[in-house]
């Protein structure tokens, strides 16, 4: 099984970390993935480089398997991050567009209602990235943060994005690219050390965070993710939980029915997280302050109906 790292030459925040990683020892040229995607190999890691949008080049894992006969175990995408604040940041996040209805067009890849399998490395690598960024002097200039689940491309294997933000000045920062390269080098065990964040289901029932609610940067979920030995699945921000206020809805299937695609989002996020962490204890954590009373009640009742356990911060130990 191989790890697929995907970079695009169209984005300096993508190709620079890939180039820094490829400058480290042990890489050899690999096959060309049709039509023109270069690849490089080191142990069980493959880096591929294309020149198109990072969020719209679908099914690269399946295309690699078909072209090479190798089985892809996981996919890691390198990308730029944008933010209204323009604040420099290094981010990690799962992907999917769970809240969209059939027929809606995702603006940044993926497909409506879809959640990628979240990489098991998200939590451990987030903590490792924070330590590395601090050790290399990027903090406090750069914020080290998780992001909520969003955008494509479509994948079929466990996936995560590593991003550098938030403006062109920072996308091109070589020190940020170097830290991202070191994260991959050490996290994948390419330097000979033990890899970080590989899930082993036989090691007992460990706790996996399923974040529900809050803003895009999920600060209350992030406080839990910073705890040692906590694993991270999907993180659903408020915009991924569209809920129709029953007092504003004229026609509803029942008096207490809350419309919107929020149920679809929660169910898809839970199922994908459960699939990535076989044997794990999936615990939903609600950002209570981000919900109105009727929203919290509806979500809590739905989680109980679906037999999804809910945890408070102190339950994640």
UniProtKB/Swiss-Prot annotation:
Enzyme's top EC category: hydrolase
Subcellular location: Nucleus; Cytoplasm
Annotated coiled-coil segments of the chain: none
Pfam families, alphabetized: tRNA_deacylase
Tissues expressed in: Ubiquitous.
Record bears the keyword Zinc: yes
Disulphide bridges: none
Role played: Hydrolyzes D-aminoacyl-tRNA into D-amino acid and free tRNA. Broad specificity toward the amino acid, but strict specificity toward the D-isomer. Seems to be required for ethanol tolerance.
The name this protein goes by in its record: D-aminoacyl-tRNA deacylase
Taxonomic path: Eukaryota, Viridiplantae, Streptophyta, Embryophyta, Tracheophyta
